[in-house]
Amino acid sequence: MSRIGRQPITVPAGVEVEIDGSTVKVKGPKGQLVKEMHRDMIIKYEDGRLIVERPANDKLHKSLHGLTRTLLNNMVVGVTAGFQKNLELVGVGYRASKQGNKLVLAVGYSHPVEIEPEAGLEIEVPAPTKISIKGVDKEKVGALAAAIRAVRQPEPYKGKGIKYEGEKIRRKVGKAGGKGKK
């Protein structure tokens, strides 16, 4: 059996789970998530625990077993605690601000870059060089963080750009311009 897939998910008090065929609906204090799981996976909700079982032991079902369990766990964690991703802006004059619901980035282009979050996502700018993304859907939070990072990825020479908090940028040594033989 899958080591991750066989672990049951404990559903905390205040979280409602509805299973309709392969569609799972999780409702909690932070919001609601609905996700379509693979039709072959068997999902049961009994005694305040979610259990995922697979119909066969072939390679496809073994890989789907752990995936389905992790997706369900992310849904439960999302509606109870939520997910957060933090970004940092590194570079002279690089800054972020909020205009209404939009995130406005000044990252060295001739124009400011505006990014509007999807419904259910919240962007905060605690400092001009810090961005915080919060939401109940881990996939959407990560996708928005990746889209913001892609606006100006960190470059390897000076490390300027938008990076995840705690991300280590592999640095390169620049050219040794004009220090060779003549």
From Swiss-Prot:
Part of the 50S ribosomal subunit. GO terms for cellular component: cytosolic large ribosomal subunit. GO terms for biological process: cytoplasmic translation. HAMAP family: Ribosomal_uL6_B (MF_01365_B). This is Large ribosomal subunit protein uL6. GO terms for molecular function: rRNA binding; structural constituent of ribosome. Disulfide bonds: none annotated. This protein binds to the 23S rRNA, and is important in its secondary structure. It is located near the subunit interface in the base of the L7/L12 stalk, and near the tRNA binding site of the peptidyltransferase center. Belongs to the universal ribosomal protein uL6 family. The keyword Nucleotidyltransferase does not apply. Keywords: Ribonucleoprotein, Ribosomal protein, RNA-binding, rRNA-binding. InterPro entries: Ribosomal_uL6-like, Ribosomal_uL6-like_a/b-dom_sf, Ribosomal_uL6_a/b-dom, Ribosomal_uL6_bac-type, Ribosomal_uL6_CS. NCBIfam families: L6_bact.
